[in-house]
Amino acid sequence: MSQQGGSFSAQTKEELLHTVPAHDGCIRAEMAAVIQACGSLVLTQRGLHLELISDHPALVRRMFGYCKKMTGQSAQLLVRQNKRLNRRNSYILRLIGRETVLGLLSQLGIWEDGMVQGTPRGLERTCCRRSYIRGLFLCCGSVTNPEKAYHLEWTLKEESLCQDLLALLEKEEISAHAVEFLEGVKEKMLMWPISKKAMAWRRCWR
């Protein structure tokens, strides 16, 4: 599960958030991953809009910049205060407008036949594939300090997304496996622990 604060996971994510995508294809791949992992389509009286929710403000700001670049429109940025003890605030990016939202999803290669698809098109390039893996990690990944105990994982809600990630990691020659578990009473989630040679994970997002 993702950790923030001063943890090694948090430090790793801060480092990754300063990664400059090689080209627009890498931007599309990273953004597609973020939308699939922590985004949702919401239908209201105002129409269709896209919401991204994260407890990492820098990630939301990064996606705000990507949205502006790809759609020419500014998304809304909101903060939701969590009143539970020791819970971080949630940061929300909201892109409004059916035409804008579906146009963006189409550009990202994850909208087809009226629904959000799995792995986006265009991940044949190594840099784009690694950008997609990086986006998933920024949303729902965690890693321990390899100098202490090596462990890297992604916590994902969709089995299809998990299978896609396994296939992408295999292309990176990183061995992984799936572990299914229950969180609370209702929510069923999936987790991918990885044990490999120390620092091998760095190939995933460079």
Regions found by a protein language model. Give the residues of each.
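Sequence-level preference for short, compositionally simple segments enriched
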Residues: M1-E51, D55-L59, L77-N89, R98, ...
